[in-house]
Design a protein with these regions (language model features):
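Core transmembrane alpha-helical segments of multi-pass membrane transporters/permeases
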Residues: 1-26, 43-51, 55
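Short helix-coil transition sites and intra-membrane helix breaks within transmembrane domains
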Residues: 5-6, 19-26, 56-68, 98-107
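Hydrophobic mid-bilayer segments of alpha-helices in multi-pass membrane transport proteins
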Residues: 8-14, 47-48, 69-74, 155-167
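Alpha-helical transmembrane segments of multi-pass membrane proteins
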Residues: 12, 43-57, 83-100, 127, ...
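Membrane-interface helix termini and inter-helical loops of multi-pass transporters
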Residues: 22-37
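Hydrophobic transmembrane alpha-helices that form the pore/transport pathway of multi-pass ion
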Residues: 59-99, 108-125, 167-172
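Membrane-core helix-loop-helix motifs of multi-pass transport proteins
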Residues: 110-167
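Membrane-interface capping segments at transmembrane-helix boundaries
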Residues: 169-184
């Protein structure tokens, strides 16, 4: 139970903040008006929400707090703009939040992972970033396609997988051309041991 206390406190504070934003500040109505008045097409909402969630979570170091802040805002906005995009926009919120938390140097999970594995904190962040960025770019493309096709799963999944494959092929070709196969690091590590 002691291990769950920080998560419970974050959730209670996030729910409190979301209640204040929803009831006292009318944040969903304000954001909805800003989105519609700004002329942002509804199809780009999931991709935009993904980027906002990633930035907010990266900046704060908490995915749970980002869930609590953004979900009460983006669900009513998605419902007002295009009800078929509610699920996709919610998924974009969750994915962006987890990506931001995973890559944030101030995230508690990142700090604990580096401490638990016995490696330098900044080194841990820098080694996680390329892998997370590959998936984030693929997700972003998938959310753009999903928004354009109205939340359909297969086209967005296909676009995300195709993007990931293209990025992996590009990285492979670059590593082959530069002669970096990763073998040198393995040789250095075995020589140091």
């Amino acid at each position: 139970m002691k291990n769950m206390m920080p998560a419970n406190v974050i959730l209670v504070l996030a729910w409190t903040l979301s209640g204040v934003c929803r009831d006292l500040l009318s944040t969903p109505a304000f954001v909805q008006h800003a989105v519609t008045a700004g002329g942002i097409p509804a199809g780009f909402l999931p991709a935009i929400v993904f980027v906002i969630a990633a930035f907010l979570s990266f900046s704060t170091g908490t995915a749970w707090g980002t869930f609590g802040i953004l979900i009460p805002i983006v669900v009513p906005v998605a419902q007002a703009l295009d009800p078929t995009l509610i699920t996709v926009t919610l998924a974009a919120t969750l994915a962006g939040s987890v990506f931001g938390d995973h890559t944030s140097p101030i995230s508690d999970t990142t700090i604990l992972s580096s401490a638990g594995s016995g490696c330098s904190h900044i080194e841990h962040v820098s080694t996680q970033l390329p892998y997370a960025m590959l998936v984030a770019v693929s997700c972003f493309v998938g959310y753009v396609v999903s928004g354009i096709v109205g939340g359909s799963f297969l086209p967005s999944f296909g676009a995300a997988v195709a993007t990931l494959i293209v990025l992996l092929v590009i990285l492979h070709v670059r590593s082959v051309r530069s002669g970096d196969t990763g073998g040198e690091k393995e040789e250095e590590n075995s020589a140091a041991a």
